[in-house]
Amino acid sequence: MAVNKNGIVVLGAVFVDIKGFPEDIYVPDGRNAGHVEYIHGGVSRNVVEDIANLELRPTFLGIADNTALGEDVVRKLQRHKVNTEYMKEIPNGMGTWLAVFDHNGDLAGSISQRPNLMPILDILEENGDEIIENCDSIVAEIDIDRKSVV
């Protein structure tokens, strides 16, 4: 069990996956009626939620959008008992994966908007000593800009 205030600190990205599914046969160059799902994602966000589900009370160092969708991501993490006090909410703070699936459920196309993780460096410069001295361990996303971790 975690003994320090910040428990396991997870550092990395938040993504929101936007997935579209057609009601009928998918027409790539036409209009397709269907339904769209918004799913909170990102490897680090997923990992911190999984750690919280084990009741280890982790801390997340990440960036969310300063939008209703970003607020929803933070609220969901808080409901899972993730410490979000060091998260920042900024414009375009989250990554987005837009995916369209065909009528068989296979991926027909996608676009990924990568988040700017440099503001995590600001969090570490402002609160890094406090975060690290009050944690049990740190999990860092590997796909992070080198400047954020050096």
Regions flagged by a language model, labelled:
Residues 61-66, 84-94:
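Beta-strand->loop->alpha-helix junctions that form or flank phosphate-binding loops
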Residues 2-14, 76-89, 101-150:
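Ribokinase/PfkB-type carbohydrate-kinase core domain
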Residues 70, 95, 146-148:
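Short, well-ordered alpha-helical microsegments
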Residues 1-63, 68-72, 79, 97:
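Glycine-rich phosphate/adenosyl-contacting loop at the front of the ribokinase-like
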